[in-house]
A protein has these predicted regions:
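A conserved, positively charged/aromatic
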Residues: 77
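Active-site environment of divalent metal-dependent phosphoester hydrolases
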Residues: 42, 91-93, 188-190
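A general structural motif
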Residues: 84-92, 161-166
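Active-site histidine-anchored catalytic micro-motif
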Residues: 2-73, 175-176
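Catalytic cores of soluble, metal-dependent hydrolases
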Residues: 1-10, 17-24, 98-211
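Active-site flanking residues adjacent to catalytic metal/cofactor-binding acidic residues
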Residues: 35-37, 86, 137-141
Length: 211
């Protein structure tokens, strides 16, 4: 699909689906903008739960499951300096230590509110553009504050508003060619009034402006 010029939009249950999406993109190098309430940066050595989706970003940048990920044709780890984690506010202790020692860029919701979206993100986009001009956008819908939309059992307070989320998409589109996007981790059992569905549709509409 990517080779045909079509835009891949992946609707997935779990974040580890990123391995297949990135594999399908192939060369040239890609940045990752990962929007999630959690770090997804555990490894088999740090995880408390053993939850594979909690290791998804770490796998994408080559921190763990390297031999397994290498069995997916076309997959190559994304350099950490090209990965941005936005909106995360819940971490396991050892996961946070690992993340802080990495080259992954971490932007929490409070920094966005303190400095503004553009002021916080534009300098970072400029830095990453020295490595690549295209990006993969990954949305775990629990990046949203539960007051906006309760999307699954892992929802955590202090998240992004839908306005902030759509603003991030817009800023990415301004500076990068979008190679693909994924929307993940929706559980209808927790979605009161279909607010999460409406939020996801809003994201898709914003993404469609790229196509």
């Amino acid at each position: 699909m990517a080779g045909s010029g079509a835009f891949p939009l992946v609707l997935a249950g779990g974040c580890i689906s990123c391995v297949g999406t990135l594999a399908g993109l192939g060369a040239p190098p890609t940045a990752i903008v990962w929007l999630d309430a959690h770090g997804d940066f555990n490894t088999p050595e740090t995880t408390i739960s053993g939850f594979l989706d909690g290791m998804a970003l770490a796998t994408a940048v080559g921190r763990c499951w390297g031999k397994l990920a290498a069995t997916v044709p076309g997959f190559h780890p994304v350099p950490e300096r090209q990965a941005v984690l936005v909106g995360a506010r819940e971490f396991d202790v050892n996961e946070r230590t690992l993340l802080d020692s990495s080259a992954v860029h971490l932007i929490d919701p409070q920094r966005i509110r303190n400095h503004g979206l553009r002021a916080e993100l534009e300098p970072l986009w400029a830095k990453i553009q020295t490595y690549t001009g295209r990006a993969y956008l990954h949305f775990d819908l629990d990046v949203l504050d539960p007051a906006e939309a309760h999307v699954n059992q892992f929802a955590a307070p202090g998240g992004l508003t839908l306005t902030e989320l759509l603003g991030i998409v817009s800023l990415v589109r301004e500076r990068f060619a979008l190679a693909a996007a994924a929307i993940t981790a929706y559980d209808p059992e927790y979605d009161e009034g279909e607010r999460a569905v409406r939020a996801a549709v809003g994201v898709i509409r914003e993404l469609s402006k790229q196509v």
